[in-house]
């Protein structure tokens, strides 16, 4: 499985689309707003750029993508008015892997711009937008061309399934039953990928440029702790139930692994300091409930829909597409049972960085 070819959120605007099932991600963006706001204020008041070049890495599609744009424009407009300056030109780069539904994203752009003008008037900008398909574990932009890099709920995804994890039988991710070699392989791939991310962004950001990165993570130093692995353990349970029913071959489940690593703040800090191009302004964690909806009764349904929007393309690349309704129905039942018995939360790691030179 080539991750770069199959990793993307469900496109379009259907029942299983990411656009209609990304409330958790929206809440996380709103929770992170004060950190984004401070980074943008510090950036603008130190550089006063006439053109602001901003990259949203792992932008996906839907309202959340434009929520980030709206936040940034409003922050800068408020700040530049304080100083009595003319509004800068905004240049937003939307980056994601080639399988992302860029068409749906850009079809919504006109309506978003019109709505933004209604809220803050005609005096800002102009704003320019471009789509940049490609992996953020490679170079994406010219040297020293960016002022600000934003990424939310993307950097936990790895560039590939780690090598040497063939013995992770019965699991689809790191779990307490995973051999130590599997845990080490996952961390090694994360270390390679995040180090490359920092290296390439250090080349693309100008001196004094900022990054605000939010990713699924963990507070524990145990990479197999429930706070980061449980959601995938439950999906593995659903798949293994279908194995027992004879609908999926056991070898198919054994050969499937999620290309993701959810780091602790200490792991993020270590790699940032090791790479050496950035200072850490803030590094913190937050929590968000699996069921971000106010509809508590349908919690299992809401969470399984959210996870389907995220994971279905990966699953379809390995299992029969016709099985997906059954897989996620099983998953919903398992999640509902789990949520009735225990507290279920995602842990977020947020880091704000400044480019040193």
UniProtKB/Swiss-Prot annotation:
One of its GO terms (molecular function) is methyltransferase activity. It comes from the Eukaryota. SUPFAM superfamilies: S-adenosyl-L-methionine-dependent methyltransferases. One of its GO terms (biological process) is methylation. Its EC number is 2.1.1.273. Pathway: Aromatic compound metabolism. The record marks 150 as: Involved in substrate discrimination. Converts benzoic acid into the volatile ester methyl benzoates. This scent, mostly produced in a rhythmical, diurnal manner, attracts the pollinators. This is S-adenosyl-L-methionine:benzoic acid/salicylic acid carboxyl methyltransferase 3. It comes from Petunia hybrida.
